[in-house]
């Protein structure tokens, strides 16, 4: 990875983290899009699985620091998602919009499944409702936002023409 492509990837990562903490709270949706998952997935497909897991762990610890009730749940979930995204990059590393949307959807849904099961705040029918209704809706919103971000941020994500 060249210095220029590394700088563009870092800029994209920081923009997505900034959007997560500025734009997402303003929307206030019940099934919100998750820009941290976008940042994690886009960073993880560019590195080896262990580094993807470390990126996920770091993002998870940062996001969990804001919600001490569920400290560690986000770190575990993002570590698993970062590892799996990096491991599956050969399958999903295509310029196919539907495949990228499915990649974002699956990444967010797996994160939510792990997060809400490990968190232990919900139980019974509330957990089932969260995992089978609200999490897929949030994953769909994340996938739509991810595809739109791929179109908007294409100059930052493509390798430089030499």
List the model feature ranges, each with a label:
Residues 1-162:
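Terminal, non-globular segments
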